[in-house]
C-alpha cells in the first residue's frame, strides 16, 4: 500500500507523519510505502529544525527534502492523508479525479473532522505536542491497516 501524508509546505507535519509512520509500520510489520508532500511546497526544502529535534527525541531521524504534491504522486497513492480539512479541499480541487482516496488523517482514523495542530513558527513544545498527536493517530492508523489486512 502506498500512503502519502500531505500538509502545506512539507516541512513540519507531513514529514513528521512520514517518519513516524515508517517507524511504526516497521515495528508492526506493515508492508507500506510512505511518502509526504505539500500542497504549496517548494521542492528541495529542509524540514524545520524543531521538527527534526522533536523526532530526534524519539530516536527517529528526519532527513527530509520537501516535495510538492504532483499528479504522479496522486496517481501512485492508494491513500492520501491530509493534515487539515483545508488541505483536503485543496487536493480535491487540484486533483479531483482522485478524491475517493483523499481523507484527513483524523477523518480516516477516528471519523472526526478535526485538524492536526500546525506547529509552524511555534516553540519546540508546540512541535512536541504535534508530534505526540501524530504519533497517537498513526498508531491507530497502523492498527486499522493491520485489521483491514486480515
UniProtKB/Swiss-Prot annotation:
Name under which the protein is recorded: Protein-arginine-phosphatase
Knocked-out gene: effects: Cellular protein arginine phosphorylation is only detectable in a ywlE mutant and not in the wild-type strain, and global gene expression is significantly impacted in the mutant strain. Cells lacking this gene are impaired in dephosphorylating McsB-P. They also show a reduced resistance to ethanol stress.
Known regulation of activity: Efficiently inhibited by Cu(2+) ion, Zn(2+) ion, sodium pyrophosphate and N-ethylmaleimide, while the addition of Mg(2+), Ca(2+) or Fe(3+) ions has minimal effect. Inhibited in a competitive manner by vanadate.
InterPro entries reported for this sequence: LMW_PTPase, Ptyr_pPase, Ptyr_pPase_sf, Tyr_phospatase_low_mol_wt
Gene3D superfamilies: 3.40.50.2300
Catalytic reaction(s) noted: N(omega)-phospho-L-arginyl-[protein] + H2O = L-arginyl-[protein] + phosphate
Annotated site (Important for substrate discrimination): 11
Catalytic-site annotation from UniProt: 7, 13, 118
pH dependence remark: Optimum pH is 5.5 with pNPP as substrate.
Binding, substrate: 8-13
Induction per the UniProt record: Expression is up-regulated in the exponential phase of growth, followed by a significant and gradual reduction in the stationary/sporulation phase. Is not up-regulated during ethanol stress.
Natural source organism: Bacillus subtilis (strain 168)
Amino acid at each position: 500500500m502506498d500512503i502519502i501524508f500531505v500538509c502545506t509546505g512539507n516541512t513540519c507535519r507531513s514529514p513528521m507523519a512520514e517518519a513516524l509512520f515508517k517507524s511504526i509500520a516497521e515495528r508492526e510489520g506493515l508492508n507500506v510505502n510512505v511518502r509526504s508532500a505539500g500542497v504549496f511546497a517548494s521542492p528541495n526544502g529542509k524540514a524545520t529544525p524543531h521538527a527534526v529535534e522533536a523526532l530526534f527525541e524519539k530516536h527517529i531521524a528526519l532527513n527530509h527534502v520537501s516535495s510538492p504534491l504532483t499528479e504522479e504522486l496522486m496517481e501512485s497513492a492508494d491513500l492520501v492523508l491530509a493534515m487539515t480539512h483545508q488541505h483536503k479541499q485543496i487536493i480535491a480541487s487540484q486533483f479531483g479525479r482522485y478524491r475517493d482516496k483523499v481523507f484527513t488523517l483524523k477523518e480516516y482514523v477516528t471519523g472526526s473532522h478535526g485538524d492536526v495542530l500546525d506547529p509552524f513558527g511555534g516553540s519546540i513544545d508546540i512541535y512536541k505536542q504535534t508530534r505526540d498527536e501524530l504519533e497517537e493517530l498513526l498508531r491507530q492508523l497502523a492498527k486499522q491497516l493491520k485489521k483491514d489486512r486480515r
